[in-house]
From Swiss-Prot:
Main enzyme class: hydrolase
Subcellular location(s) of the protein: Cytoplasm
UniProt name for this protein: Exoribonuclease 2
Organism field: Vibrio parahaemolyticus serotype O3:K6 (strain RIMD 2210633)
Reactions accelerated catalytically: Exonucleolytic cleavage in the 3'- to 5'-direction to yield nucleoside 5'-phosphates
Length: 668
């Protein structure tokens, strides 16, 4: 009788229109119900029946009404769906195809699915990894959720899954770009390449490196200064801005480095062969010569030129470090000529490092964590590699080269691809002064730390403090590093200018700078200048690559450390973040990140306080842990599905002593 009654429908609509509405995000729970989060302090309960219309993370408009004496939200209108393209796993439900999203909050969802036209059902089995797209949503007028599978990533039990799934998740390629049959040299007709094959350049890289893009030569003068020459591989000799390969390089932005494998920005035949500075092979290069004083000051005689060079020795970091640090290396014995060059390069690097320590900012030494994998993609070991003397030698050479490029591009064109950093966020400067200089006895003022020199002085001061607590606090108040086409300073390095050009095989921004440096050499207008979008594009690529690297690492850590909770293995954790729920620590033995919930420190909310603003954890108002502290921990849980680690301290905090009464005192 009441079905399809227009008057009833109109009445219902009027009632709904008069009810208050709120906009917010959906937060799902494991129990079927959820919440509409309007802001950090306001949320409304969503009963299970209404939750069936939405997904965790959806942005919606909901009607707020009272049911059973409780305010509840009924989602009505979809503003933005949280799930569009996503990664999931195949689940067969009563013989029908479903997909379960690979997301911690969505793993209880099983969404009905179909295959995109052209995909074969026989290729899909329970647990297989797929790319799917949400094509129907109840808040869009559809009856139910429905997804379309657009591609299969890999089989359920494939050990390569961490890499392929993560790359698909971030919409990144999983292979190198296709090469071409014949690469041709496309130099400007006026570009003269100086014949420098007789100069004994050396390359220093990892033992397995194939894309060697920098070669070095140094000569110490009678006065004790250093004449440094840096030669960099020249892929822009083969790729012009109009080439299809240039578009591919720009779309990729960088070579992707993941644990155990990389995906090159350029085809391997170019990156690992034609442009790689292989020992004994003649290669086109862009070179820079500069004099660096014995005090580490970069001279004004910076000169860029094109050349044909030949590497005279392909050296490895560890062998060179052993030789420099111990006087010999079991694996490598240099000729007298190469020994002199390496020694001069090393002395140059010490002079530059000392200058930077006094006048700029030197980042603290932290290990690089490296996964050693078997052919079957199992983790054999996790190595903590410290940066040694040969690594620092190359690093100082590259920093010097990039300062030279920055100065040259600023002077000649007032543009280029610059790495910049703005120091502290302006709104946080007063807070930083209060933190480091509460009594006003130190040199740091709001005016001084807003300048490059003052910020660098602050970072140098923080580096020599007894603990890293203040350093960790202040890092949160810093701006992010950026890439842009304006010649702005790099506060975090303490440098007034910085433009990278030393990795053109691996970075698209370096290819642009190569073209601009060639314009300097030719005294012409550049064939390519960086547009206003390129910096944002590169920053976005870098962000996705870092997320991918972290996700693969988390997956491998969860695999590798799965048995540690039962073994109760002790690790050393360094606290790098504190929020109201607990602390995040880095395991110094292997680089894994783990979360310590407050309840696993002390299961008493009245007594424990985790304060994210101050970066402290207190028990009974007394600070027991703070940012930068190291503590002994054991793993309490390794969640393979979510790829997350939960840890707890080995230190046990006692129950609160019973309050003493007059009677107990007199008895004593």
């Amino acid at each position: 009788m009441f079905q399809d009654n227009p008057l009833l429908a109109q009445l219902k609509q009027q009632i709904q229109e008069n009810l208050p509405k709120k906009e917010g995000s959906i937060k799902a729970t494991d129990k079927g119900f959820g919440f509409l989060e309007v802001d950090s302090k306001t949320s409304f309960f969503i009963p299970p029946a209404y939750m069936k219309k939405c997904i965790h993370g959806d942005k919606v408009v909901a009607i707020i009404r009272t049911e059973n004496e409780r305010e509840v939200a009924e989602p009505q209108e979809l503003i933005e769906q949280s799930l569009t393209r996503f990664i999931g796993r195949v689940k067969m439900f009563k013989g029908k195809l479903n997909v379960v999203p690979d997301h911690p909050q969505l793993k209880k969802l099983s969404l009905k699915a179909k295959l995109k036209k052209g995909l074969k059902p026989d290729n899909f089995a329970e647990g297989d990894w797929v790319v799917a797209h949400l094509v129907r949503h109840p808040l869009k007028g559809d009856n139910t959720f429905f997804v379309e599978i657009s591609e299969k990533i890999t089989d359920a039990d494939d050990k390569i899954a961490p890499w392929w799934v993560t790359l698909a998740q971030n919409d990144l390629p999983n292979s190198e770009p296709a090469g071409i049959e014949n690469w041709e040299l496309k130099d400007d007709a006026d570009l003269e390449r100086i014949e420098m094959t007789h100069v004994p350049f050396v390359t220093i890289d990892g033992e397995s490196t194939k894309d060697m893009d920098d070669a070095l030569y140094a000569k110490k003068t009678e006065s004790g200064d250093f004449e440094l020459t840096i030669a960099i591989a020249d892929p822009t000799a083969y790729i012009t801005p109009e080439d299809e390969m240039d578009k591919v390089a720009r779309e990729r932005g960088y070579t992707i480095y993941l644990p155990g494998r990389n995906i090159p920005m350029l085809p391997r035949d170019l990156a690992d062969n034609l442009c790689s500075l292989i020992e004994g092979e003649i290669r086109p290069a862009i070179c820079c010569t500069v004099t660096v004083s014995k005090d580490g000051v970069i001279g004004d005689d910076i000169k860029f030129f094109a050349a044909n060079i030949k590497s005279h020795a392909r050296l490895a970091y560890d062998h060179v470090s052993d030789w420099l640090e111990n006087g010999n290396s079991d694996a490598w014995q240099p000729s007298e000529e190469i020994a002199t060059i390496v020694r001069d390069l090393y002395e140059f690097s010490l002079a530059r490092a000392e200058w930077r320590e006094k006048n700029a900012v030197v980042f603290p030494d932290r290990p690089d964590y490296r996964f050693e994998l078997s052919e079957d993609n199992d983790v054999i070991a996790i190595h903590a590699d410290m940066r040694r003397s040969a690594n620092r030698l190359v690093e100082e050479s590259m920093i010097t080269a990039n300062i030279c490029a920055g100065r040259t591009l600023r002077e000649k064109f007032e543009t280029g691809v610059f790495n910049t950093h703005a120091g502290l966020k302006p709104e946080k400067i007063e807070e930083v002064v209060q933190l480091v200089n509460p009594e006003g006895t130190l040199e740091f003022t709001a005016e001084s730390i807003a300048t490059l020199e003052g910020f660098a002085a602050l970072r140098r001061w923080l580096a020599v403090q007894e603990t890293s607590y203040l350093d960790n606090r202040i890092r949160k108040f810093q701006a992010y590093s950026e890439v842009g086409n304006q010649p702005l300073p790099h506060y975090a390095m303490g440098l007034d200018i910085y433009a990278t050009w030393t990795s053109p095989i691996r970075k698209y921004g370096d290819m642009i700078n190569h073209r601009m440096l060639k314009a300097v050499i030719l005294d012409k207008e550049p064939v390519q200048k960086p547009d206003d979008q390129v910096g944002e594009e590169l920053a976005l690529h870098r962000k996705h690559h870092k997320i991918a690297e972290r996700n693969v690492s988390d997956w491998l850590y969860a695999r590798t450390l799965a048995d540690e909770p039962s073994k109760q293995t002790c690790f050393t954790g360094e606290i790098f973040d504190i929020n109201r729920a607990g602390a995040r620590v880095r395991l110094l033995e292997n680089g894994a990140a783990a979360f310590i919930p407050g309840a696993l420190i002390l299961d008493n909310k009245e007594r424990i306080e985790c304060n994210g603003d101050n970066g402290t954890i207190s028990i009974d108002k007394e600070v027991v842990y703070k940012l930068g502290d190291t503590l002994e921990i054991v793993l309490a849980d390794v969640n393979q599905e979510n790829r997350s680690l939960v840890a707890k301290p080995t230190q046990v905090f006692a129950d609160q002593p019973a309050p003493q009464t007059e009677q107990t005192v007199s008895e004593e």
